Each structure stands twice: as structure tokens, then as C-alpha cells.
């Protein structure tokens, strides 16, 4: 038997409407509205929100987003016609917030813009000012001199063709730093670019510091962010590795310490 406290508990839930993402949610039909009305009558349940998700709001044409918005409003009308009033209605993701404020309704769901990043290259960047807030840093773990003929990292994909100074950075794909950056990406040390040499390992990768004077163990390494006049952006990392900025923001693993700064 349920206790008195359990009988008095109220579950607050939200109803998802599928208007075009074809992921999860009720379809926009009379039958779906009937089911939602039945849910609203269940004891100990309060429907506090109803929402949908834009599939193409980050595209140049906003017609698909407005088609979804119209479907969403139609579903709300069907539900309200059955006597169900849902207080919070929302559908705007980051692209919607920036470009179609008329769809913002009672609440919005900012995602990538919280990082100061753009949802896509098709979004009008003149509408809002964004500043990237996420950076990724490490320190030089080892420095060595290599002569011509040596091969660096797994598979020997980088061959030393002249005398080089190589620094090891203790970060790898185990931290979410993409292996796709092997022999393509670079980091910043003392405000200068240090190209990645060879494959990114699970926990380490190597960079060329031949032209950066006096690099030593413990020197700061910027993998994402600004150092002096140079900057590495999430978009650059994504383009080089065949990923996109959302993935890089999500793939940094829990073993990487987070430091949060106010203001």
C-alpha cells in the first residue's frame, strides 16, 4: 500500500510533440491530443510543459522551422480544446533563439550558444554577439631532440626530415581530443603554433617546437582558446578532424578537470 506521503506526491512532467524531428514525441493528431488529455486527468501528475524541437532552425531558410512551429501551435490548440491548460510551452534551441525570436514562447533551451559558439555557419552572426567561454589547456610533459630518419608515434606516420625539437603533451583521445587531428592540428605554446607530429595517442601527443625558443617541461600549452595573438577555435578543430563544434564540446571526458570562472 502507498503511504500517505506517497499518495500526496505530485510528478511534474512535460509532453514532447514530434513536429518534424522524427525522434521521440506524440504525433500531431486528434488521437494524440486525446491521450494527453487522459494523462492530464491522472492523479498525482501535473503536466507543466509541452515542447517540440526544431530540426532545421540553423539553416538559411527558416521555412522548415516555421512549418514545425505551426504544427506545434496546432497541437497546443487541440490539447487546449480538451480542457487541458499547460503553463509552459517551448520549442527554441540555440538557432531559434538567435534567429526566430517570435518562436521563443514561454521558455527557451540554449545549448551551444552557452559556450559562445554558433549553431552553424548559416546562422546570421550579426543578430547577437557571442564570445567563446571554453578553453582547453595542458603543460609540456617532455622535450627531446630528434635527428632525421626517426618516426613519431603509432604507425610512424610522421618522419623527421631535419633536426627537430619535439615536445610531448599529456592529452589524448582518452580526454576527448580527437585522433583526427593527427598530423593536421596544432597547439599554442608561448603564443606560437606548434604542429602535431604523428598520431594522437590515448593519453599523449607530440608537437614540433623547433621554432619556439626555450620550450621546457611545465610550459603552458593551449589546445583550445587564445594565447598571445593566436587563437584555436572549436570550429577549426572540428574542420580539421572531420567533426563539428558540438561534438568537441561534448566529448571532453570527465577525467579532464574543469575550472569555472565568474565574470
Segments the model singles out, each with a brief description of its role:
Residues 145-263:
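C-terminal accessory subdomain/extension
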Residues 18-139, 143-147:
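Active-site loop/helix belt of alpha/beta enzymes
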Residues 1-11:
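Single conserved hydrophobic/aromatic residue that forms the stacking wall/gate
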